Amino acid sequence: MKVISLFILVGFIGEFQSFSSASSPVNCQWDFYAPWSECNGCTKTQTRRRSVAVYGQYGGQPCVGNAFETQSCEPTRGCPTEEGCGERFRCFSGQCISKSLVCNGDSDCDEDSADEDRCEDSERRPSCDIDKPPPNIELTGNGYNELTGQFRNRVINTKSFGGQCRKVFSGDGKDFYRLSGNVLSYTFQVKINNDFNYEFYNSTWSYVKHTSTEHTSSSRKRSFFRSSSSSSRSYTSHTNEIHKGKSYQLLVVENTVEVAQFINNNPEFLQLAEPFWKELSHLPSLYDYSAYRRLIDQYGTHYLQSGSLGGEYRVLFYVDSEKLKQNDFNSVEEKKCKSSGWHFVVKFSSHGCKELENALKAASGTQNNVLRGEPFIRGGGAGFISGLSYLELDNPAGNKRRYSAWAESVTNLPQVIKQKLTPLYELVKEVPCASVKKLYLKWALEEYLDEFDPCHCRPCQNGGLATVEGTHCLCHCKPYTFGAACEQGVLVGNQAGGVDGGWSCWSSWSPCVQGKKTRSRECNNPPPSGGGRSCVGETTESTQCEDEELEHLRLLEPHCFPLSLVPTEFCPSPPALKDGFVQDEGTMFPVGKNVVYTCNEGYSLIGNPVARCGEDLRWLVGEMHCQKIACVLPVLMDGIQSHPQKPFYTVGEKVTVSCSGGMSLEGPSAFLCGSSLKWSPEMKNARCVQKENPLTQAVPKCQRWEKLQNSRCVCKMPYECGPSLDVCAQDERSKRILPLTVCKMHVLHCQGRNYTLTGRDSCTLPASAEKACGACPLWGKCDAESSKCVCREASECEEEGFSICVEVNGKEQTMSECEAGALRCRGQSISVTSIRPCAAETQ
């Protein structure tokens, strides 16, 4: 349990009375409806949507009615799900699956079981002796809206086994279960945390700041409030109501219970849930935000990459600030309670936290010392939730009983917790114009994030924080201020003083001038005043008028864009490729359409991957074949665990092994998949032995791109890199050129990823923005007069970073990152030719 730090500053020197005037309520207003969408050939309906013109605020009326309207229509295009599947099997729904899954005893067609409907007994080839999936496995396939914290409809078909027979054993249930083909890993491991996490926040403003979610887009970085509870809407509404009358502080009590852990497969190997696949098929191939926004409403913004099944306990207790102050609770900062002595749920120490105990009893406002809060519970029986909404300060045993009863119910009624997410657009595949629709869904997600940007809100008074909740804006107030606009109360200590500036929303894009368009925003929502800080960021932004990715897709899938002539002639399905398949195959192949082949995991494509539908209605296919390039893990000895866990490993990929259950590894811990498709060194040389006394073990010295974990060096993650020199690099597998840093390239090489340096002009490197002191890179130093970072001289380098090979004036030489960065900073043209010293490349 964390050590509790209570920043409840009541005994401050000087209070500043807030003389703000009350803000008039602002009623929500709808904008006009957008035009009707194209008529859907499958549902014979069209939709239109209206956005919010004015968000309700300060207690004003909400918008009434639905944002969407739907009407019947006569389509001018057919339904894509009625087309054939070429060499693949067509389910009744129109979804296509591999013919190898037909008559295998499993219902791989999600909703209709068409693949098993007409199979004779003699044709059936059962692929496994059991078909019982792990309990609650269907939860791992749900979509998730990261802004609302709510799970949405199913996007992954968790019922399909993919023709595989992978089993997992539950020690608790003493039974074997069969894993879905979409699950990479599933582990039954019960984890019960007996240490509760207690946190105090001196205002809802502090709490919202702490729990905000930061979203990074192509244009800017934005922060939005997101409750981790599925009841986030009721939480924020209640918070707004409760702060109209007085100031509250928050005590947050949290804990989790885990019963299983899962990792889903990579997106290209996931089978989509049939309803989700249908919705993707119905999406228009021309960008229409209304249609794509409707998909986000139904299925969320992300899908689950991994997570745990279990329960999450989280209760917010509101404590009256004035009552805490009246009880002279002003020295908690100096008398922090120790984590071993302060437990509301399990026990209550009689010493060390007496001031806190007395203050909370007084602030509870009840005779029986019951502190009531708002529970946000995920998982477990619904009948236990009411018992978790309060704490009896004099009866910790009773608190424990109620919590334990709920925790036991989690085993049978778990929910997904501790989830890691991947954007939903990564699942756009196996439908016509999939690449175009994937790009459009990314655009729609950007617009969706814009709807939750606080720039739509009017300023809160006294430095309050505005957040968007549906069609309303809410104000979260700083300590000792309250009201619908935070207009009442007092600002305390260093909270008092000036008002920080806030950004307005971006303007519309300007007309194109010389191939570029611009937009702007102002720091006037509110403007800085009284010595407050100005906004951080740029006031203008420019970009190319034509999206480069969209232009590329026009060449790759011209039939997905308006043409002067509508294609009337089509090629048959592309020819099959052994050990490979067509990416985003679709169902229609008009003249001029290109398709791209790729190989199954563990194979690499040799030759030209692009085939084209010719005017003679025949496919123009070059020489190509799939060559095996992967290693497979052997059966490991008991107790040995491998990371990462994958069905196949390509040449150059690295696997690390470790021991569980108090054992230590004897032998090598890292193995490389060699060009002969064998592991080097041999994995049979690794085994687990009884762990020695950790006091006698030497601490290994890790490389700069490694970190110490469990007494051994493991690869860092790219985001763990500090400031490092920017370079352009190409992913040798996808051939995509990305902006990276020297440190990130070392980390990716450590993880077995193959990246090579390219010229600086081959990608767009981050602009060298002017930085304040405290954020200077290796090659920068602080200028005391301007309080800004300026370029170092190469001779002034202190922390040098990595040694790299740099070409300067046509000659290669080894220098540190700091020295190279100093030259680039001063405008000299340099080229990084290797992320290692020059001599290391020639050896």
UniProtKB/Swiss-Prot annotation:
Residues covered by the MACPF domain: 124-456
Residue ranges, annotated region (CCP 2): 616-693
Pfam family, one: Ldl_recept_a
Intrachain S-S bonds: C28-C63, C39-C73, C42-C79, C85-C96, C91-C109, C103-C119, C128-C165, C337-C353, C433-C560, C455-C505, C457-C473, C460-C475, C477-C486, C512-C545, C523-C535, C571-C613, C599-C626, C631-C673, C659-C688, C702-C713, C715-C750, C721-C743, C728-C763, C773-C782, C776-C789, C791-C825, C797-C818, C805-C838
Domain LDL-receptor class A residue range list: 83-121
Annotated keywords: Complement alternate pathway, Complement pathway, Cytolysis, Disease variant, Disulfide bond, EGF-like domain, Glycoprotein, Immunity, Innate immunity, Membrane, Membrane attack complex, Repeat, Secreted, Signal, Sushi, Target cell membrane, Target membrane
One GO-annotated biological process of the protein: positive regulation of immune response
Biased composition (Basic and acidic residues): 121-132
Annotated control of activity: Membrane attack complex (MAC) assembly is inhibited by CD59, thereby protecting self-cells from damage during complement activation. MAC assembly is also inhibited by clusterin (CLU) chaperones that inhibit polymerization of C9.
Glycosylation sites: W36, N202, W503, W506, W509, T696, N754
Entry PTM: C-, N- and O-glycosylated. O-glycosylated with core 1 or possibly core 8 glycans.
InterPro entries recorded: C7_FIM2_N, C7_KAZAL, FacI_MAC, Kazal_3, LDL_receptor-like_sf, LDLR_class-A_CS, LDrepeatLR_classA_rpt, MAC_perforin
Phenotypic consequence of T587P: Confirmed at protein level
CDD domains recorded: CCP, LDLa
Quaternary structure annotation from Swiss-Prot or TrEMBL: Monomer or dimer; as a C5b-7 complex it can also form multimeric rosettes. Component of the membrane attack complex (MAC), composed of complement C5b, C6, C7, C8A, C8B, C8G and multiple copies of the pore-forming subunit C9.
Name assigned to this protein: Complement component C7
Annotated source species: Homo sapiens (Human)
